[in-house]
């Protein structure tokens, strides 16, 4: 057989020469390569021993595959190559063929030599009944070790091919299977190191280079690779830091080993070691490491110790140079210090089961090495660290050792032992273990059994130390129970609670304490955002869960705010809020740009608002509700009380302010929130009467406002309306702070935040909403902009039955225009329960302060537009509207005469209702939204509550695609309020899987904390169509919303009301924003819409002014008829472009 193999080898040499001949074309070279592959395969299968002696497996890889791969890779990387795309295609095809070749070769080798690999799929599983081997008599049976080697060779190169194809997970799997097959061969470990290096994992890279060297058959290139990696680490600059993160510690740790391995700058070892010991203790108590990292650190130390003095040197007398002795001393000191801290950590944290800080595997590995090197106990550095042994004894006694543990003969390897099989420094310790079963050695409760086996082996090592080093440890046997004792006094560490700061990830541990100390109202708000339930208990969770937000908050920490406010903000930070919501916090009119990137939960996100006279200098404190301030001085009819949110004066700063904050346009709301834009705050918000319920609702509004703002609002509520209970704030969008909190809590709600239309919303929120509505039903379009009775009617038509409104028994005074925030209707189907719980309190408390008012829009409001001064708004109508708004359900269970008048004609008419037409004319609504809303008594509420209005619900159900787009920028700001409205239910009904919770935080472009659940609305983007930055429902990206005024054509359109909560399909398909810029989609149609709106407003004026005190079906019917006619005329123009 050797003759035939020799003949194959000669033919292979000829083929290799032909392949290097430049005269041959690609086709001839390809043919020669295929022939060479076939020859080598035959040699490996027929005479494996001969082939391995001739290194055929290496020639096969190098000449048949690697050289060609390297050539194609070089050509593909050359950007000047005009045929790059063709080369890349050829490379992909060649890698695919190479993978197939080695897979087939491995399968054939296993079949021919009857090798059973754990990673191999047997032929029977592939449907192959029999494997008839041809020429079986000609096959020379190889040794089992040769079979294992060639199979490992195939697995390694399969991993290489997968790595070239950027399939890192598959490559790692191949490498690990290869290492398990022959642990004494260093090649798989070298490849794993290369793979880890490509991922930027420096600690794992060094670990596997050490593993590749410290084996029976080290891989030659591993030593060179390790030297290069350590040299590169030494060349990096040192950064002076008082506190290190894990990455800082790893860099310093690798530098330390670079000094030792390369014997360079040894004078730096001692100070660097001391710093490493100090930071290791701090990080370990903070649970910054995981179990695998601790094992890697320990093994790297053991590798260096073994490299300096192996076992052969232990038994013989050797003279060491001064440098070698210094390196050994410093390394051993570092190793023993780490061991002591590892023994102390589980006692301090009492969390052995925690994967984040589980040091026992590293302790086990360290103790195994000490048992193999008994002379180490005589070293001076070990004597200097006798405090280790009392800690070790406490650890062993915590296992409740028994005499039976010493006789345990379980040979099953632990995970750390399985990982380190073949490691020369520990090889003798693993001789009695059975690695043949791989990871399947333990069945049933693996973790529990492994924990007990590890404890038993540690107890056994402790007993060995007690027998051989009685001066350090003694062991007493009391009726089968073991007790370890020592005469060495135990060292009490400095308060390790410092470690519990949760360093790195939790640098702002204060945030957690603040959240814990925060008022129950704030907690409830946070919990609401987090969980559908309104329970305050859930509020605590957000504090712990949203640690990611802490970092962004650090950025804002620079701003000085009252501690009280900071607390609230801290909690808010924990509950990720859409950047848009946070944006409103900033005072600058350009907030839109900043707000996207400033989460509300950040302290700096809420600078003090100088425009608020009554507001305390601390920006975090939210002033009590301000008396109604109507720019026009308009007053509502007697008997009608309008929340301050609705009464915000049109005098509010122009849209610019609103835009900057992206906050709701309602001044009262911004005033409540320190983060509201200064100009907006200056508006009548301040003058809102303390009776406004928004304050009470603020706690429930966690969506929009920061926790601090919520707290401030609660205080203000108590001041303004001490008699009012602080209900769930979630429903009252007017309260920006409340909304922010809710948004933070609810990830899906946060999606709304990104639009951060709060400021624009306050201005022309309703109209803009319609601008952004998709080609959805005119009613739906209208609903976002006009959430007043019109909106109610539309949703009522669709959902009125399912949503019985609260009995129309609210007093006019209690009924606030903001209450018309159709929170209940907005969440009509899924949010009913939540809304039922929250709507009354939230609406009342939030609406007055935070309602978005079209008045705030730069467009001046007509005197009649002012909700207070508008004579067009009949008291009865106001009362009825307020009652409807107050009622959580959209259904009018006990509507006054006005309700039937409104519902009957509006809901039943086949054509568009007045409100529908208004909605269809977003531009008009935008310009006259304040007037219309004030006329209807919904102006403020609609603006503030567009998200929660029943039209939103309708959008949520029917207009999922355009729901987000439909929402106005103001709606986006109101999103927070919507969330607060639905504290119990985070719009789960309309949100499929696109809620913030389902969305990865990282997708949230505006969220400073990508991990935070309630992070900015961008989180929803994953659900929405990729073309838009909208939330799952299609809400435009917060960034777009914030930078541009939604009401302006140049601003991004946003669906902040119910649309954001719609299913992802709505955002992807229906969202007209997708087709065009989200902000300016409707702006192009603004003039026509404004004209129609003006005409409609004039007609309303004439009708309502004539019968102001006698609202009845006749006036409404006339208005509806006019509206219907107008709709028919300009219906085309009213529909938003898609």
Curated annotation (Swiss-Prot):
Biased region (Polar residues) positions are 525-537, 584-597, 649-673, 990-999, 1063-1082
Cellular component annotations (GO), alphabetically ordered: cytoplasm; cytosol; nucleus
Location of N-acetylserine modifications: 2
Residues that the record marks as modified (Phosphothreonine) are 575
Gene Ontology terms describing biological process: nuclear-transcribed mRNA catabolic process, nonsense-mediated decay
Q: Where is the composition biased (Basic and acidic residues)?
A: 548-582, 854-868, 1037-1051
Task: Reply yes or no: does the keyword Cytoplasm apply.
Answer: yes
Q: Work out whether the entry's keyword set contains Transferase.
A: no
Region Disordered: which residues? 515-612, 649-745, 838-871, 990-1090, 1106-1138
Record's subcellular location: Cytoplasm; Nucleus
Q: Which InterPro entries match?
A: DNA/RNA-bd_Est1-type, Est1-like_N, Est1/Ebs1-like, TPR-like_helical_dom_sf
MF terms from GO for this chain are: protein phosphatase 2A binding
Bias (Low complexity): 674-721, 1000-1026, 1118-1132
Coarse class of the primary localization is cytoplasm
Start and end residues of the TPR repeats are: 152-185, 187-219
Keyword annotations for this protein, in alphabetical order, are: Acetylation, Cytoplasm, Nonsense-mediated mRNA decay, Nucleus, Phosphoprotein, Repeat, TPR repeat
Q: Which residues carry this modification: Phosphoserine?
A: 519, 732, 848
Description of how the protein assembles with itself and partners: Part of a complex that contains SMG5, SMG7, PPP2CA, a short isoform of UPF3A (isoform UPF3AS, but not isoform UPF3AL) and phosphorylated UPF1. Interacts with DHX34; the interaction is RNA-independent.
Q: What does this protein do?
A: Plays a role in nonsense-mediated mRNA decay. Recruits UPF1 to cytoplasmic mRNA decay bodies. Together with SMG5 is thought to provide a link to the mRNA degradation machinery involving exonucleolytic pathways, and to serve as an adapter for UPF1 to protein phosphatase 2A (PP2A), thereby triggering UPF1 dephosphorylation.
Protein name (database record):
Nonsense-mediated mRNA decay factor SMG7
- Protein species of origin: Mus musculus
């Amino acid at each position: 057989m050797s003759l035939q193999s020799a003949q194959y080898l000669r033919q292979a040499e000829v083929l290799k020469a032909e392949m290097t001949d430049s005269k041959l074309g690609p086709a001839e070279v390809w043919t020669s390569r295929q022939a060479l592959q076939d020859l080598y395969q035959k040699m490996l299968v027929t005479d494996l021993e001969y082939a391995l002696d001739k290194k055929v497996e290496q020639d096969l890889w190098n000449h048949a595959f690697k050289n060609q791969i390297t050539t194609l890779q070089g050509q593909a990387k050359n950007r000047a190559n005009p045929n790059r795309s063709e080369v890349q295609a050829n490379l992909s095809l060649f890698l695919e063929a190479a993978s197939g070749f080695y897979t087939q070769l491995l399968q054939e080798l296993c079949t021919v030599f009857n090798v059973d690999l754990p990673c191999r799929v047997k032929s029977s599983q592939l449907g192959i009944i029999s494997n008839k081997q041809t020429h079986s008599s000609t096959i020379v049976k190889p040794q089992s070790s040769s079979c294992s080697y060639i199979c490992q060779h195939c697995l390694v190169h399969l991993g290489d091919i997968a790595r070239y194809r950027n399939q890192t997970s598959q490559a790692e799997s191949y490498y690990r299977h290869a290492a398990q097959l022959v642990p004494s061969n260093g090649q798989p470990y070298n490849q794993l190191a290369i793979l880890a290096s490509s991922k930027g994992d420096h600690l794992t890279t060094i670990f596997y280079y050490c593993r590749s060297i410290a084996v029976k058959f080290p891989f030659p290139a591993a030593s060179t690779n390790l030297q290069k990696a350590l040299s590169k680490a030494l060349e990096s600059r040192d950064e002076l830091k008082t506190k290190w993160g894990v990455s800082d510690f790893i860099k310093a740790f690798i530098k330390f080993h670079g000094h030792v391995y390369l014997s360079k700058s040894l004078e730096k070892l001692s100070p660097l070691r001391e710093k490493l010991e100090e930071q290791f203790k701090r990080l370990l108590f903070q649970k910054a490491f995981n179990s695998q990292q601790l094992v890697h650190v320990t093994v790297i130390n053991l590798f260096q110790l073994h490299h300096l003095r192996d076992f052969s040197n232990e038994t013989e007398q050797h003279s060491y140079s001064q440098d070698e002795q210094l390196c050994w001393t410093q390394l051993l000191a570092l190793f023993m210090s780490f061991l002591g801290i590892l023994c102390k950590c589980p006692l301090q944290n009492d969390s052995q089961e925690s994967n984040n800080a589980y040091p026992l595997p590293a302790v086990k590995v360290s103790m195994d090495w000490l048992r193999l090197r008994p002379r180490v106990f005589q070293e001076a550095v070990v004597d200097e660290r006798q405090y280790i042994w009392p800690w070790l004894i406490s650890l062993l006694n915590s296992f409740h050792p028994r005499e039976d543990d010493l006789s345990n003969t379980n040979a099953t390897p632990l995970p750390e032992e399985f990982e380190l099989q073949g490691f020369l420094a520990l090889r003798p310790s693993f001789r009695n273990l059975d690695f043949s079963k791989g990871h399947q050695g333990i069945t049933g409760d693996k973790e529990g059994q492994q924990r007990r086996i590890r404890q038993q082996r540690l107890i056994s090592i402790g007993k060995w130390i007690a027998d051989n080093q009685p001066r350090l440890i003694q062991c007493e046997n009391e009726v089968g129970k073991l007790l370890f004792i020592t005469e060495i006094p135990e060292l009490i560490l400095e308060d390790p609670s410092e470690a519990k700061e949760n360093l790195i990830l939790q640098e702002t541990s204060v945030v957690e304490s603040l959240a814990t100390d925060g008022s129950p109202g704030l907690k409830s708000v946070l919990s609401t955002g987090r969980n559908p339930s309104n329970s305050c208990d859930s509020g605590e969770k957000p504090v712990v869960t949203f640690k990611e937000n802490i970092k962004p908050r650090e950025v804002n920490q620079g701003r000085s705010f009252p501690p009280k406010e900071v607390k609230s903000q801290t909690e808010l930070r924990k509950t990720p809020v859409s950047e848009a919501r946070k944006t409103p916090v900033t005072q600058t009119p350009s907030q839109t740009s900043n707000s996207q990137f400033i989460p509300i939960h950040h302290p700096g996100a809420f600078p003090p608002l100088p425009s608020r006279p009554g507001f305390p200098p601390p920006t975090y404190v939210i002033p009590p509700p301000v008396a109604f301030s109507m720019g026009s001085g308009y007053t509502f009819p007697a008997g009608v009380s309008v929340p301050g949110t609705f009464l915000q004066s049109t005098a509010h700063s122009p849209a610019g302010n609103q835009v900057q904050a992206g906050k709701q346009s309602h001044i009262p709301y911004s005033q409540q929130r320190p983060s509201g834009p200064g100009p907006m705050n200056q508006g009548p918000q301040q003058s809102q009467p303390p009776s406004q319920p928004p304050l009470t609702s603020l706690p429930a509004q966690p969506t929009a406002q920061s926790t601090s703002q919520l707290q401030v609002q609660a205080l203000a509520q108590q001041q303004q309306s001490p008699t009012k209970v602080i209900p769930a704030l979630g429903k009252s969008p007017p309260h920006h702070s409340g909304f922010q909190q809710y948004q933070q809590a609810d990830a899906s709600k946060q999606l709304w935040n990104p639009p951060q239309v709060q400021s624009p919303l306050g201005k022309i929120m309703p109209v803009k909403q319609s601008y952004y509505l998709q080609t959805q039903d005119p009613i739906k379009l209208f609903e976002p902009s006009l959430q007043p009775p019109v909106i109610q009617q539309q949703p009522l038509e669709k959902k009125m039955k399912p949503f019985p409104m609260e009995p129309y028994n609210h007093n006019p005074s209690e009924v606030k225009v903001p209450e018309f925030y159709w929170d209940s209707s907005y969440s009509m189907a899924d949010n009913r329960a939540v809304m039922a719980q929250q709507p009354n309190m939230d609406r009342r408390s939030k609406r007055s302060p935070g309602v978005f008012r079209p008045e705030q829009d730069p467009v001046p409001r007509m005197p009649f537009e002012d909700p207070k001064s508008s004579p067009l708004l009949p008291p009865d109508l106001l009362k009825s509207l307020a009652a409807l708004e107050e009622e959580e359900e959209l259904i009018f269970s006990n509507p006054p005469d006005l309700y039937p008048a409104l519902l009957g004609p509006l809901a039943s008419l086949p054509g568009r209702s007045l409100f529908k037409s208004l909605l269809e004319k977003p531009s008009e609504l935008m310009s006259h939204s304040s007037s219309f809303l004030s006329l209807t008594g919904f102006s403020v509420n609609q603006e503030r509550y567009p998200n929660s209005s029943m039209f939103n619900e309708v959008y949520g159900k029917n207009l999922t695609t355009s729901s987000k787009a439909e929402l106005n920028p103001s709606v986006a700001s109101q999103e927070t309020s919507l969330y607060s409205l639905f504290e119990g239910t985070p719009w789960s009904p309309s949100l499929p899987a696109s809620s913030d919770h389902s969305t990865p935080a990282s997708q949230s472009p505006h969220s400073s904390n990508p991990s935070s659940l309630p992070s900015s609305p961008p989180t929803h983007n994953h659900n929405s169509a990729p073309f838009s930055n909208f939330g799952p429902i299609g809400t435009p990206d917060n960034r777009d919303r914030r930078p541009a005024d939604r009401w302006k054509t140049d601003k991004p359109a946003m669906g902040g009301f119910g649309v954001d909560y719609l299913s992802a399909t709505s955002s992807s398909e229906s969202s007209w924003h997708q087709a065009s810029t989200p902000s300016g989609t409707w702006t192009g149609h603004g003039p026509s819409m404004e004209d129609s709106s003006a005409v409609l407003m004039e007609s309303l004026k004439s009708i309502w002014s004539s019968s102001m005190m006698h609202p009845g079906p006749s006036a409404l019917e006339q208005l509806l008829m006019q509206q219907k006619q107008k709709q028919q005329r300009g219906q085309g123009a009213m529909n938003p472009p898609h």
